[in-house]
Regions:
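Helix-coil boundary and N-terminal low-complexity module in membrane systems
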Residues: 1-111, 118-222
Length: 222
């Protein structure tokens, strides 16, 4: 009985992880409400989940706001760039949709390809910012480089990120609503945590062996 209630019990370890992801998810969502701070919030979330995967996490809230503060400037600039590019892509898709004939279809395919690139960049750029010191230009360039070089991992992370869309195919409104609420409570944190298993494997390839585990690596261009 004592062993069952031990904090080292796998069940309690799992539940602690779930609780941490719920807390992390809610903090991230709250800090994303002023859209301009979303970049810093997502970066901070990945800072924590990357540590969780390495079993280095201590205080979720403290670690989150440490990264939020340290990376705020760069993350905000990158976020504004991503918002601007996303807005342009949205307008381009609408223009292509309203174009008559085959020209509209061709442009629609072209712009959808750019949307995929945009989404892949989104998957990598904030985790890279959370893990490496670098310039904004090199952070974006390295995000594209890693996404292409580690394409199998990229495909898996894309599929993980698209999993919430499965909610649209659930016929029962009650089940759909329940899962949607559950996703709002911990969904983004779970996605970041799952992606972090792959990101840790990727990032380890670019980390100096002698680097202290508590610090980011100095931003060598990969």
């Amino acid at each position: 009985m004592g062993r069952f209630f031990s904090m080292d019990n796998k069940f309690f370890t799992f539940m602690n992880k779930v609780a941490d992801l719920c807390i992390l998810n809610i903090i991230c969502l709250v800090c994303c409400i002023p859209i301009v701070t979303a970049g810093a919030s997502i970066t901070a979330m990945y800072y924590v989940t990357l540590k969780m995967v390495r079993n280095e996490e201590a205080y979720i809230v403290r670690s989150f706001f440490k990264s939020f503060k340290d990376n705020f400037k760069q993350a905000t600039i990158i976020n504004l760039i991503m918002i601007a590019v996303g807005a342009v892509l949205y307008l381009d898709l609408n223009v292509a949709k309203n174009m008559p004939g085959s020209a509209g279809q061709i442009f629609h395919v072209i712009f959808m390809a750019f949307v995929i690139i945009y989404y892949v960049l989104f998957l990598y750029v904030y985790p890279i910012l959370a893990r490496f010191y670098n310039t904004i230009r090199n952070t974006i360039k390295n995000a594209l480089f890693m996404a292409i070089r580690h394409l199998p991992y990229t495909v898996v992370m894309v599929l993980i990120g698209l999993c919430p869309l499965l909610l649209l195919f659930i016929c029962s409104y009650q089940i759909q609503s329940t899962l949607f609420v559950l996703f709002l409570v911990m969904g983004f944190g779970v996605i970041a945590y799952c992606n972090s298993f792959f990101l840790v494997k990727i990032f380890d390839l670019y980390m100096p062996k002698e680097e202290n585990e508590e610090q980011k690596s100095e931003g060598t261009e990969v």
